[in-house]
Design a protein with these regions (language model features):
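A short acidic, Gly/Pro-enriched loop at the edge of an enzyme's catalytic core
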Residues: 35-36, 46-58
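A short SAM/SAH-binding and catalytic strip from SAM-dependent methyltransferases
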Residues: 56-69
């Protein structure tokens, strides 16, 4: 609901989740905090239930690593963004090759480790779909937290939390309200 506060009463936030349980939970939370400018849609990150060029910002928190089709995730974000729109993602990325025992472990995949893409691959995928100003910023302070996810696996030696940002080209608006 941080996004709902950020866009103010004139803005609108659309939350997407692939499970009806999370949609219902989000709707209940929205009612509880009296958020009037939010709506929730059932959908997958690889097939967003939004029209082309309708969003100013696409935000995702620790979901991309769970997708088996990461290029489609980034292509969908590009599709739904207006020209000049931005992606802001917090996710787990690999800093080096992840051992097979972690990429094949259901616990590691569910724990956001096994499906993490290499940092350089994330940059490449974003650029290939057309994004500009691509920045993937590792967060080394996440090491201790990641170590606690799967004790004894050394997962923290392979992955880190990262902030992923990029811009869809074409936004030439000079007004202070554009994509704010």
């Amino acid at each position: 609901f941080l996004a709902a506060r950020r866009v103010g009463t004139g803005g609108r936030v659309i939350g997407v989740d692939m499970t009806i349980e999370m949609i219902n939970k989000a709707r209940g939370n929205a009612e509880r905090v009296e958020a009037k400018n939010v709506e929730f849609r059932l959908g997958e990150i690889e097939h967003l239930p939004l029209a082309d060029a309708t969003a100013d910002v696409v935000i995702s928190n620790c979901v991309v690593n769970l997708s088996t089709d990461k290029p489609s995730v980034f292509a969908e974000a590009f599709r739904v963004l207006k020209p000049g729109g931005r992606v802001a993602i917090s996710d787990v990325v690999a800093m080096k090759a992840i051992p097979h025992e972690l990429t094949e472990s259901l616990l590691a995949v569910a724990g956001c480790v096994g499906g993490a893409a290499q940092l350089t691959d994330v940059e490449r995928m974003l650029t290939e779909v057309g994004f500009e100003d691509v920045r993937v910023t590792p967060r080394p302070e996440s090491r201790e937290v990641i170590a606690g996810w799967m004790p004894g696996t050394s997962a923290e030696d392979y992955v880190t939390s990262a902030t992923i940002e990029a811009t869809k080209p074409g936004g030439d608006c000079c007004e202070p309200t554009c994509c704010a």
